[in-house]
Amino acid sequence: MASLFTLAALRARYAARPEAVRDVVDEVLARVDASSDPAIFISRVEDGALQSAARDLLARAPDPESLPLWGVPYAVKDNIDVAGMETTAACPAYAYRPAADATVVERLKAAGALLVGKTNLDQFATGLNGTRSPYGAPRSVFNAEYVSGGSSSGSAVAVAAGLVAFSLGTDTAGSGRVPAAFNNIVGIKPTPGRVSAAGVVPACRSLDSVNVFAASLADGVFVRRLIEGFDARDPYSVEPELRGLRAQPRVGVLAAKDREFYGDGDCAALYAQAVARGASLGWEMVEFDYAPFLAIASLLYEGPWLAERLAAIEPFLDAQPDALDPTVRGLIESAREFSAADAFRGQYRLKALLREADAVAKKFDFLLLPTAPTIHKVEAMRADPVRLNAQFGRYTNFVNFCAMAAIAVPSGFRGDGLPFGVTLIAPGHCDDALAPFAAAFHEASGCGAGAGKEKVALAPETADDGRIEIVVVGAHLTGQPLNRELTDGGGFLVEATRTAGDYRLFVLPDTTPSKPGLIREPGFAGPGLEVEVWSLPAESFGRFVNAIPAPLGVGKVTLANGRAATGFLCESHSLQGAREITALGGWRRYLDRERGVRHAGQ
């Protein structure tokens, strides 16, 4: 089995020998030709054209470090436009040849990535299973009798099978998450609007989101950051915002009454294990009422939002109804029974449900849900295409209605070896803040990536787009009085960690709010102190540092892993007679002790 392509491995190869890009292209072509699944791609860049693209890249940008995705092979779902290649949306009669790239493809090409081909999908992105295509049904890389998940079926399988380093799909109801779960990879669904959908065949235009599949959070987040950003071509495009989450998150999990797995005892047990894994990571796991979210989810295929799918292709459907997959046609044509009045009633119902769901969601930093409650064989899905497909969307359909960010990660394996995944779902624009938690969960699962369960670099890198990290130790920690100075300035939490062992912590006298003073004493053997690393835009960092009052200042703080980052330090002369709290291990422990809160071991 071919090993997965990762950004780190490709960068290392290219740094040693830039001409290796031609070898990588040859490897990609050989892997595609040797693939046992003929339904992954609908169309491919011709072999000679892909080899020529590698030569052109070497000629125009000979330094691999000059472009962020230099020489990285990727694929896109075939409802995303690529200039000069047909867009079919898995419907041959609908096919057209666009003159311009979709915005996301344009950005990937500018970053130096090499397109391998366009992947299969449930026709018109209507389905979560991957069988609704005249080009065949891609299969789970773990067992060819089982569905790959959809609608972004080929995109997920292409990554999991090691044919490309990453791929793009689209996600309206869960199409960028369910296939990730069924193939043991990562699926990143951004906050709606963060990534442009210009040049994408719409399913439900008001809900559609372009997603990224990758072997790891490190790779997926890197790609997402490159393709996101406001685009005037897309009326639903928004400027990405930066919102943080607490270092010790409160996580919503399904109550026992809401844990529906349709008789799949293995998946039920794996979800219980996932909840326990979250607790082992230090997360506070709290059950919540899923009812309003389930009611929102049902609107997508049982309410007037079906009419939005009709609006996307109605002239074509009217002209060539027999060109559609029978199941897809039946679903979309059923929208004709809804009236304009029904559409407004649906909006009113959605608003009421969103109010209920928001009241629940605001109690948590993020939710941890099964990505899909079970998996089915291809033949079973074809025999019962609507009911079984609906099962896959039980825990995914609501997310875009709620304008939330979601990351699907591997979480375990059933007794028969098929993968199970979970999805972390956070408020909109917490995309970057959510990623470290998803990476930590993925790593703790031990599932690796793809059919080979390969161990890959999991943690996302901190964005390097003019942002600066700052280590905070006291009143700026998550949940503390001055934390808003970070979040209001566009800051997001990178990680919660500890300092090296040679730091000491004191309570500064006469400060409001109360603040600690951190100093380094070489040779001191301490426990290391709890800190948080935050990322700030450069302009916010300057204002933030300028406002720091004496005796505090900034300098390099060495973390427990040996990395040094800019952080709060204190002038030592101000600590004469100050109370030392180093033994407590951190500022929060000191505050808890002052309030009479006891911790294990105390």
PLM regions: where:
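Serine-dependent amide/ester hydrolase catalytic core
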Residues: 9-15, 29-30, 120, 246, ...
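Acidic/His- and Gly-rich active-site-bordering loop/insert found
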Residues: 50-52, 60-133
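Short helix-loop capping/hinge segments that flank enzyme active sites or metal/cofactor-binding pockets
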Residues: 68-91, 248-254, 304-358, 410-419
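Short glycine/serine-rich loop segments
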Residues: 101-102, 106-224, 400-423
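A short helix-breaking turn/cap at a secondary-structure junction
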Residues: 189-269, 273, 292, 355, ...
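Glycine-aromatic micro-motifs
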Residues: 439-440, 444, 449-601
